[in-house]
Amino acid sequence: DSRSLTCELGSGPVFVAMCGANHDSHAFVAQMYARGVRAFMVERPLEALPECGYVVVENAIAALQCLAAYHRAQFRGTVVGITGSNGKTVIKEWIAEELPAGMKCYRSPKSYNSQLGVPLSVLMLEGDEELAIFEAGISKPGEMERLERIIRPDVVVFTSIGDAHQENFLNLEQKCDEKMVLAHRAETIVYHSYYEPLGRMIASRFAGRKLCDAASCPEVPETLIGNEASRRNARIVEAFCAAMGYPAPSFTEAPEVAMRLEVKDGINDSVLINDAYNLDLNSLALALDYLHNVALSRRRTLVLSDIAQSGLTDDELYGRVAGMVARAGVDTLVGIGPKLKRYAALFGCDREFYASTDECIARIGRRAVAGRAVLLKGAREYRFEKLAHALARKSHTTVLEVDLDAMIHNLNYFRA
């Protein structure tokens, strides 16, 4: 994104200049060069720039997709593709939460499921993950074939089928056909036969594959998850875990996906960015990028928990975190957890540390919050939603009750 250049970018960023019906990103090449970018993928030759390299391609998005497909081909872990009309992100996050302890998993950030979002998310794979989960979304025929070549999923999870983007398809069967392209090479397919005609079409077309129908999984009690659609999603997650040989999900609660990069007014004239659902290096980089865009002239506070299951040594992990924090221009780091405190010397900004989220809520200073843009970025087990509630500006509802009978009585009294 040419508007921000704050996330961790490895040995050097590449700016991909794309042309669309109403935009031409080549207009930002000079700006990106001035900000230190020295590698470009463009659709037409550039004017000579010192110490600059560029590749000219016919179509930048298509070239990016080819690059992502090559990167995916080097990956040796298991790849999961999730598609459907609704519930892709919810099920992705839910699956990630229910994985066995210690498993290193990558999942695509936010809802990166488009022709551009999928290659970007695939290129974020570090390569040593055991499991990678990607969303694939389409809006018209022909799109899924390109996404399938990039993702090449070993396992495909189908969510619900509904009317989203139906205007571009002749009927629901054609839409199901298009979505099923994602399973072209998949060995395992998870679906819910409640959603027709998808269930019937999958059972017919992929009869020779390993099929896991969520309808055969035990019902999730309404006392645990009240919403019917969420209970169906839960059974899809249960079917996935069974297909993979993982322990059965706990289903203590449905994932609160709205907690991702949610902006709210905070106490003491602050702005809160709540990204308290999960934490890894990729999602931290994206969240810091978002903080840069939201903060504008405000000072920046990052409230961060310890990071688990990164696959890196603590020295390497927190060294990288410190570099990301410095490049993002964070003014104050509020660290929660013993490991961040142990590596306090790596951070050059103002900093304060707490052993737990509850201690942070009780003791965090006004100076770290007042008038600032505050990013809350925590692992699920740290329950940062409690911190978000404590730091959010409270609004109260006032109810005005009017007794019309009494008003008429009073009016008649004074008329008399």
Role assignments for model-derived ranges:
Residues 256-259, 274-286:
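Glycine-rich phosphate/pyrophosphate-binding beta-alpha loops
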Residues 288, 322, 404, 408-415:
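Generic structural signal for well-ordered alpha-helices
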Residues 63-188, 197-205, 366-367, 385, ...:
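Phosphate-binding loop of NTP-binding sites
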Residues 20-22, 46, 138-141, 162-164, ...:
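Short glycine-rich anion-binding loops that position phosphate/pyrophosphate groups of nucleotides
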Residues 11-17, 120-132, 154-156, 291-311, ...:
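Mobile, glycine- and charge-enriched loop segments
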Residues 13, 32, 67, 82, ...:
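Residue-level signal for inorganic ion chemistry
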Residues 42-51, 154-271, 297-298, 323-332, ...:
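Acidic, Mg2+-coordinating active-site environments of NTP-dependent enzymes
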Residues 1-66, 294-296, 310, 316, ...:
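N-terminal leader/targeting and accessory segments in enzymes
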